């Protein structure tokens, strides 16, 4: 699209729909200026944390100025709808929860990088724009913004060889995925003469050019790399291990959520010509990811790598139900993406607190007898572990039950069986963690310390894990409306 045409047709009134994004951008700019003018001090550290929290809160409040449930703005390059708004609110809340842990983590390491605050804001901005567009250029730029921010944050502690290695792997493979996405976008535009994914999908039929097929495959491949689908996952365990644990939690929760949104938006536009290819390819990738992800997690001794492979397996769970290409499948996928961001972030934040001890090395053996030293952390970690496993009455159980139901409705029973088998495999390492924490008689020589904000964040995540598990319709009703609305809009086009 010609940029002059875009600017000429844009009503300045439409900028009100970007207030949350604009607020985050202003927050990043203010933090950047403060980093330049303020000298290093304890006061500066506290100011950065609280100003970050303030701007995130203002961004949340700015959603109240929006009065549209569906609207294409800026000549159709940006879409305002309930899925985008819900996703962005979730991403902001997850960022709010991560910041206190990141602040404490850097303090404890005696290496305080102020730039990590505005880089986090820029990554959040990329996630927000990624969550609200069907336009190939906006999606590509958003992917770049999130990815570059993650590369930098992964290599935050450059003195560590592991940090360097993980960051380099992430940079190289992430860069390849961006190039693949760009090639895919170029092929799709060349074949369809449109930058809108909705129009591109509708333009496909059985007589279409092979270039459109190649473009779609390349574009989906780029997202498969980003969310860690096997066999495109090689960067993820190393990057998650290399990054500071609060950043790992941020990437595994808000990052995964943002990367999945474009795939979720795609489902209602898979037409009859694409359905068979979509179901076969997506279901095979999902089955491999579920089984191999859990099998690799089973042999890990490092807790961060274990949770990294668990994250890969959960991407497989979400992908499996997307293969059904149904309204129920989309509802289950949206629900599972959101609930994983809660329980996944909670597990990584508990590890972040444990890492504050100099004696902690993230080894599975070190968690033995943890309940003796810190009951709150042990119980919280157990709650998140049971949720990841899918034990009632947690949100993880509801999520997996909905995924299985979504597969059963479309008679994809074999993939449902794979889901059950993968969950059975995961029992081996999840239960081992809980047994070590509560039943192993080992004397722990360290006691984790955490402040009130960290306590509140973990407590809130534990509450949500139980509350949304026991009252699933609180979240489910809203997500059902989102899914039905997306299919309704697709059918009207």
Swiss-Prot record:
Catalytic activity: a quinone + NADH + 5 H(+)(in) = a quinol + NAD(+) + 4 H(+)(out)
Membrane topology summary: Multi-pass membrane protein
Keywords: Cell inner membrane, Cell membrane, Membrane, NAD, Quinone, Translocase, Transmembrane, Transmembrane helix, Transport, Ubiquinone
InterPro entries attached to this UniProt entry: NADH-Q_OxRdtase_suN/2, ND/Mrp_TM
Main location: membrane
Residue ranges crossing the lipid bilayer per the database entry: 18-38, 47-67, 82-102, 111-131, 137-157, 171-191, 210-230, 244-264, 279-299, 334-354, 379-399, 412-434, 456-476
Gene Ontology cellular component list: plasma membrane
Broad enzyme group: translocase
An MF annotation (GO) of this entry: NADH dehydrogenase (ubiquinone) activity
EC number: 7.1.1.-
GO-annotated biological processes: ATP synthesis coupled electron transport
Localization per Swiss-Prot or TrEMBL: Cell inner membrane
Superkingdom, taxonomy of origin: Bacteria
Family statement: Belongs to the complex I subunit 2 family.
Functional description taken from the UniProt entry: NDH-1 shuttles electrons from NADH, via FMN and iron-sulfur (Fe-S) centers, to quinones in the respiratory chain. The immediate electron acceptor for the enzyme in this species is believed to be ubiquinone. Couples the redox reaction to proton translocation (for every two electrons transferred, four hydrogen ions are translocated across the cytoplasmic membrane), and thus conserves the redox energy in a proton gradient.
Subunit structure: NDH-1 is composed of 14 different subunits. Subunits NuoA, H, J, K, L, M, N constitute the membrane sector of the complex.
Name of this protein: NADH-quinone oxidoreductase subunit N 1
Organism annotation: Hydrogenobaculum sp. (strain Y04AAS1)
Record gene name: nuoN1
């Amino acid at each position: 699209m010609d940029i002059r045409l875009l600017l000429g047709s844009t009503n300045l009134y439409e900028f009100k729909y970007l207030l949350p994004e604009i607020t985050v951008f202003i927050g990043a700019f203010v933090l950047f200026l403060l980093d330049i003018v303020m000298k290093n001090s304890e006061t500066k550290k506290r100011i950065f944390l609280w100003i970050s929290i303030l701007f995130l809160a203002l961004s949340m409040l700015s959603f109240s100025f929006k009065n549209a449930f569906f609207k294409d703005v800026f000549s159709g390059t940006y879409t305002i709808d309930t899925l985008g708004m819900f996703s962005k609110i979730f991403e902001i809340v997850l960022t709010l929860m991560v910041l206190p842990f990141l602040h404490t983590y850097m303090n404890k390491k005696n290496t305080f990088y102020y730039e990590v605050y505005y880089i986090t804001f820029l990554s959040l901005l990329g996630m927000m724009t990624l969550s609200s567009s069907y336009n190939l250029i906006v999606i590509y730029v958003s992917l770049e913004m999130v990815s570059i921010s993650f590369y930098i944050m992964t290599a935050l502690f450059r003195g560590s060889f592991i940090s360097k290695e993980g960051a380099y792997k992430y940079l190289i493979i992430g860069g390849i995925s961006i190039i693949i996405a760009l090639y895919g976008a170029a092929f799709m535009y060349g074949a369809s003469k449109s930058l809108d994914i909705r129009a591109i999908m509708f333009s496909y039929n059985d007589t279409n050019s092979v270039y459109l097929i190649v473009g779609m495959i390349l574009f989906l491949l780029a997202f498969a790399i980003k969310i860690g689908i096997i066999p495109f996952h090689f960067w993820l365990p190393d990057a998650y291990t290399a990054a500071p644990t609060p950043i790992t939690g941020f990437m595994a929760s808000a990052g995964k959520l943002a990367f999945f949104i474009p795939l979720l938006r795609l489902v209602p536009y898979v037409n009859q010509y694409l359905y068979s290819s979509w179901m076969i390819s997506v279901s095979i990738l999902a089955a491999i990811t579920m089984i191999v992800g859990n099998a690799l997690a089973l042999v890990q001794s490092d807790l961060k790598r274990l949770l990294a492979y668990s994250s890969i397996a959960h991407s497989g769970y979400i992908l499996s139900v997307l293969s059904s290409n149904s309204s129920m499948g989309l509802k289950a996928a949206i629900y599972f993406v959101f609930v994983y961001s809660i329980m996944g972030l909670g597990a990584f934040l508990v590890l972040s607190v444990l890492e504050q001890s100099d004696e902690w090395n993230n080894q599975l053996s070190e968690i033995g007898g943890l309940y003796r030293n810190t009951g709150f952390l042990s119980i919280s970690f157990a709650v998140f572990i049971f949720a990841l496993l899918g034990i009632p009455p947690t949100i993880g159980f509801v999520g997996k039950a909905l995924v299985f139901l979504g597969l059963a409705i479309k008679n994809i029973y074999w993939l449902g069986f794979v889901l059950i088998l993968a969950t059975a495999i995961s029992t081996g390492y999840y239960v081992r963690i809980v047994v070590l924490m509560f039943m192993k008689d080992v004397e722990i020589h360290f006691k984790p310390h955490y402040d009130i904000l960290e306590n509140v964040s973990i407590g809130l995540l534990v509450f949500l894990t139980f509350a949304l598990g026991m009252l699933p319709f609180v979240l489910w009703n809203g997500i059902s409306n989102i899914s039905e609305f997306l299919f309704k809009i697709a059918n009207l086009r």
